[in-house]
């Protein structure tokens, strides 16, 4: 059989076409882009609070180019004052403009390995709106007072002008927090220390309200200049990432409370409770692993966290997390507030990423209308339509990202055909076992026909496969030895066989 050469670029093109992703800008938008390139703003012309004296920093990944948030923290009497500055995209992108219509249509930026399809043109996302160090930038400011108990005591929102003091990476900040001299500026150091002190308080508050702690296993592809996969790197979630996450959650909560206080419609980020049917399915798999999940009532986040913490001690937390995640409802955008189950919050918006998420841009416009004493341009029906479209766009983008990841993993797996691995059964279905190998982030199928010289019956209630003669049982969590038999990137298919 002739081996078909794998092409990263052609696979990306197929994904773009399959998921109807738009990677080009039309003529009208290109004309607008030219205007932005020549536009010079006069900071004296706008009613903005000048906060350039504060040592804001951006903290992002090494490869980030669109810096849409900057943070600064200081002591305030016996509390903490957190400033979260978010790029003022709404200042540049007017409602129903050509760029706005295209951003609404895209809904989100789509992230592929080494390649991004942006929601906004680069002149905005990486230039005018990006909070690059040493440049005067327009922002929408969330100024939040947080008590020693981690609760928000008060908040203000206003238009502001900042100049970021430093572009830091998660690794830099994490190294600094681990007593490595990765940062030298005294004012920046003071800000980081304050942010970390606040983070520890917010972390305790998160634990107290029992927000679900999903530490999912993430990895990234190492791709060379020729777009060839040279390896896979496990991404360890750093404390610096969690620090920024907690600051963003605080700003998102404050934005939700601010809009609600001003009696305006909003576009909420909601996460419903899991259904009883999903809980029952999860409880069967968890029972096979030795965990008890109460399936007689609606599950609470405290119970989920207890199981996850216990699984970490037994070293099967990745499997347990994946089972629980499958039971969770999808988060959505809607003007109807039902709270956020996963974060254990009564009211939540997405406010902090208007460069890459359209709902955040909508929330910015609503906040700016309140600040500037203008009428809200979005009624409930408008927001409902935008929420539905944004949720669909998010799901479509995630599906595209997952599909390319699966194709790349299959291509990576071809290097290991014939190799034996230790593996764990992740899922039991009527046609076989889905397994994950220990040494690499590779998953695949052992077809039921290759399990042995007998007929295997799928007991759906117990979620097991059982041999009709030997009574051999296969269940979720079983540790087995496997051999990678074949991998077909075009079909996103990896097949294993048992090693006896």
What label would you give each PLM region?
Residues 469-471, 475:
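C-terminal structured domains
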Residues 1-452, 462, 477, 483-500:
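Electropositive polyanion-binding surfaces
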Residues 449-456, 469:
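Classical nucleotidyltransferase
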Residues 458-468:
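Short, structured beta-strand/loop micro-motifs enriched in basic residues and often containing a Trp
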């Amino acid at each position: 059989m002739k081996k078909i050469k794998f092409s990263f670029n052609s696979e990306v093109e197929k994904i773009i076409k399959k998921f109807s992703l738009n990677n080009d800008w039309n003529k009208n938008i290109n004309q607008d882009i030219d205007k932005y390139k020549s536009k010079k703003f006069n900071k004296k012309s706008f009613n903005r609070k000048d906060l350039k004296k504060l040592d804001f920093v951006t903290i992002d990944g090494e490869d980030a180019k669109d810096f849409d948030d900057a943070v600064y923290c200081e002591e305030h009497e016996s509390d903490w004052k957190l400033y979260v500055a978010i790029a003022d995209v709404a200042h540049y992108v007017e409602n129903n403009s050509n760029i706005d219509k295209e951003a609404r249509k895209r809904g989100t930026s789509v992230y592929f390995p080494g390649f991004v399809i942006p929601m906004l043109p680069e002149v905005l996302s990486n230039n005018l709106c990006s909070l690059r160090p040493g440049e005067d930038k327009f922002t929408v400011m969330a100024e939040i007072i947080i008590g020693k108990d981690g609760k928000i005591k008060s908040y203000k929102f206003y238009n502001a002008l900042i100049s970021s003091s430093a572009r830091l990476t998660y690794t830099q900040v994490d190294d600094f927090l681990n007593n490595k001299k990765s940062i030298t500026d005294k004012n920046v150091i003071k800000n980081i220390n304050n942010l970390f002190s606040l983070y520890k308080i917010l972390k305790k508050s998160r634990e107290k309200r029992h927000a679900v702690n999903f530490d999912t296993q993430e990895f990234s592809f190492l791709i060379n200049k020729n777009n060839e996969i040279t390896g896979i790197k496990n991404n360890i979630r750093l404390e610096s990432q969690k620090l920024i996450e907690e600051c963003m959650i605080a700003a998102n909560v404050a934005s939700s409370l601010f809009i609600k206080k001003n009696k305006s419609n909003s576009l909420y980020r909601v996460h419903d409770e899991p259904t009883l049917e999903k809980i029952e399915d999860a409880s069967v798999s968890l029972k096979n692993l030795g965990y008890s999940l109460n399936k007689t009532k609606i599950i609470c986040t405290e119970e989920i966290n207890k199981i996850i913490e216990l699984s970490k001690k037994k070293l099967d937390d990745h499997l347990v997390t994946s089972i629980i995640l499958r039971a969770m409802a999808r988060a959505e955008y809607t003007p109807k507030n039902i709270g956020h189950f996963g974060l254990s919050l009564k009211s939540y918006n997405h406010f902090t990423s208007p460069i890459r998420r359209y709902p955040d841009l909508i929330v910015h416009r609503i906040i700016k209308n309140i600040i500037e004493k203008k009428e809200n341009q979005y009624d409930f029906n408008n927001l409902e339509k935008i929420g539905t479209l944004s949720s669909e766009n998010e799901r479509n983008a995630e599906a595209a990202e997952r599909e390319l990841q699966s194709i790349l993993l299959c291509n990576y797996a071809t290097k290991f055909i014939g190799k034996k691995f230790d593996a764990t059964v992740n899922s039991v279905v009527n046609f076989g076992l889905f397994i994950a190998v220990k040494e690499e982030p590779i998953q695949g199928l052992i077809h039921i026909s290759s399990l042995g010289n007998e007929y295997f019956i799928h007991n759906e209630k117990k979620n097991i496969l059982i041999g009709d003669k030997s009574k051999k049982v296969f269940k979720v969590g079983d540790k087995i030895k496997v051999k990678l038999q074949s991998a077909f990137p075009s079909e996103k298919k990896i097949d294993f066989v048992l090693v006896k």
